[in-house]
Amino acid sequence: MKAEILCVGTELLLGDIVNTNAQYISKELANIGIEVYHHSVIGDNENRLLKELERAFNYCDLVITTGGLGPTKDDLTKESVAKFFQEDLVLHEKSLKQIEKRLLCFNKSMTESNKKQAYFPKNCEILENPNGTAPGFIIEKDNKIAIILPGPPYEMQPMFENKVIPYLEKLTNCTIKSKVLRITGIGESDVADLISDILESQTNPTVAPYAKQGETTLRITAKANSEEKALNLIVPIEKEIRQILGDNIYSSGETSLEEVIASILVKRNLTIATAESCTGGLLAGKLINFPGISSVFLEGAITYSNESKINRLNVKKETLEKYTAVSKEVALEMAEGIAKSSGTNIGISTTGVAGPGGGTYDKPIGLVYIGLYINGKTFVKELNYSGNRQFIRNITVTRALDFLRRNLE
């Protein structure tokens, strides 16, 4: 089965709202083995929407739309889909009562505009929306399936998970399970080379690598006639991949790198403080995303100038003069200085040239040092990257977290 995701809303085209719906739906469809053929974004215009539906169904069996189900005149998705399938819109009394009840929760009364949200194509399956006033629906006709969902993610995602996925799993006539392995420290091409034999010989399960900034994910997907059999198919492939990639795999599922590290720190009761120059607080910000980190994260210092490194972290003036701020020697003194002044088990530091200016022949843009102090032991890592300022800062944070992880495990 091939699918297209069609996100409706002029606000998406104008860039006022980030289109997270397409990303979420693509990921969920991949989990159940449905190929996403195309993504589209279109404004609130009936003629364009009809043309887009016509084009999409020339290539796909399934079109999933989000947005355009609101109460205003420019919310036209439902009307356009009904016209495409040559269906009349009829009032659904149960939905009308649910919308009215929902409005009462906000001390609002039913209006004619809201009543519009209770009209649906005559022959469709209605998807209740306990989180808003816009129910979705599924319509099947002439070997075409359209799944129409509300735009707000907090309404769309529960509806997709609770209603759409069970519906689609029945259509595929088999159980599909996936396991995601998260990898950092090596790039996507290196991962692909290392597991090339697995990638070239894959049938069921399939193994698909995906890259994003600073890490790679591997999705192992198996099909079988039961959940147990599908999961059993994944086990030997996962084991083989883990043997090849080793500690480059930092987690599975949705667990992020900072969550892995924060869990280790909390579990072992290891306190930590950060001293940042080029990353400007991004490293501390990643760590404090984790609930409960306050028990071990004591302090974060942004020491951008040489004076602040000397006064706050006790970096020696002679070290700065001899080696400059961007050096392994200064990175180590920063890490040790923040740990000792904060009274923590661990100190971690970043110093480098993020650009766009400031680079020299000896200290080019993209040169970064990560310093690490753990209970009296010190470690340092040199990085060299090309890219813009934001990329260099973000990749430094990822590499710093990974450097810490590897020295804790």
From Swiss-Prot:
Question: CDD domains from the xrefs?
Answer: cinA
Q: Output the Gene3D superfamilies linked to this UniProt entry.
A: 3.30.70.2860, CinA-like, MoaB/Mog-like domain
Q: What is the superkingdom listed in this entry's lineage?
A: Bacteria
| Entry-linked InterPro entries | CinA, CinA-like_C, CinA_C, CinA_KH, Competence-induced_CinA, MoaB/Mog-like_dom_sf, MoaB/Mog_dom
PANTHER family attached to this UniProt entry: NICOTINAMIDE-NUCLEOTIDE AMIDOHYDROLASE PNCC, NMN AMIDOHYDROLASE-LIKE PROTEIN YFAY
Family as reported in the entry's similarity comment:
Belongs to the CinA family.
What is the name of the protein in this document? Putative competence-damage inducible protein
